[in-house]
Amino acid sequence: MTRDEKIYFSLLRIGLGTESPREILPELAKLQWGEIYRLAVRQGTGALIWDALRQLHAMEYLPLSLRVQWAYNVEQIEDRYRKQEKVLAGLSKFYASHSISLMLLKGYGLSFCYPCPEHRECGDIDIWLFGRQREADELLCRE
């Protein structure tokens, strides 16, 4: 594992709240920030690493253009999360009005275990309808 990858994982643990910020600031000045950013985006952890950098007051280590790009990316993650919240609330209300129970699975539900739920990137919304999927699909098609 490279030095940058080790620091990435340390930043991830800080962002998740499982590691207290330690004296890694001297190491941060030496990082290849473009590579850290690409790794974070590829792994879906860009907002979590951003949280760690904010906790460490380490933004000055990032080139300005990367800082702006990263901040914009975090805003996009938060916007998608809010949209998913609205969709999930609508689905939940719709199914409840038809007496169909819904269980939220994986991604979005797990976000509540994170220090900042809207910084947990989620793909789609996975739900279980307790064997009533076909009926639920038909109801949605009629709406």
Predicted regions and their residues:
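Catalytic metal-binding acidic patch
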Residues: 115-140
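Helical scaffold of the NTase/Pol beta-like nucleotidyltransferase catalytic core
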Residues: 2-9, 17-106, 133
